[in-house]
Amino acid sequence: MDEKITSRENAKIKYACRLSSSAAFRRSEGRFLAEGRKLCPELARGAQLENLFYTESAMAKCPELAGLPGEHYLVEDHVADKLADVGTHQGVFGVFRTPVHTLDEVKAGGRYLALERVQDPGNVGTLLRSAAAFGFDGVILSDGCASVYAPKTLRASMGAAVRIPVIEAGAMPDAITQLRAKGITCLAAALYKSQPLSAAQASCPGGVCVVIGSEGQGLTDETIAACSSTVRIPMTDRVESLNAGIAGSILLWHFREESL
């Protein structure tokens, strides 16, 4: 029988809560907390599940949770309330090991998405999901991006955070330099002095990296200068711009895997 946790002050519960609330703690521990009856099993397909916390009612609704790996703990409802990031939850939580990937894994001829200082968790999650859907080989994040493993980002990505390699690369211009050294064309998404998509698509025989900037400021001048060229999405004058999640997803679709 699984161990039952009745106290909100239990050490495992306090540890899991800290993973949920602190990006620095997630990085130092190499772990993250996720919640949801669908999300936890989905994440377990691509990341190591160490601890599963569930309420009695959650297991009754989703008995297949019993087949997941890791240590399982039955928690009382008030304990689950402490673990939850939002007021209404499904009573299922998992502590996972964070997958680790580096720029050394980037392959010539691959398709990549790079995000520079994209701070909205919803946009980061949406772009991870789009990159996975359109057959991209990895996502590269600069310093200052929203945490991939924060609760809101995980919900938005719907498990894509472990279905596609995520590389935390630090300074984006340096990452772009490494990508270009492998023959990858790096396209900076920019509103001005940019080539149209049709021209950009014809110029990427050796792989492509779509580079998206922050919601408010866009890409830094240094990153734009490091890229091969700039690209824009054709639009009417009825709107000034699109948010990072929408613009990035459109670009990812244009450079999707050829078999799709």
Predicted regions and their residues:
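Boundary-proximal intrinsically disordered activation/regulatory segments immediately upstream
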Residues: 1-60, 145-146
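Short acidic-hydrophobic, aromatic-tinged amphipathic segments that line or gate anion-handling sites
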Residues: 4-7, 73-76, 165-172
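Short, aromatic/basic amphipathic alpha-helical patches
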Residues: 60-69, 223
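Glycine/small-residue-rich loop that forms an oxyanion/phosphate-binding "nest" at active or ligand-binding sites
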Residues: 68-97
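RNA substrate-binding interface of SAM-dependent RNA methyltransferases
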Residues: 100, 105-194
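Structured adenosyl-cofactor binding patch, chiefly the S-adenosyl-L-methionine
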Residues: 133-134, 148, 152-161, 221-260
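Active-site/ligand-binding-proximal alpha/beta "capping" segment
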Residues: 187-239
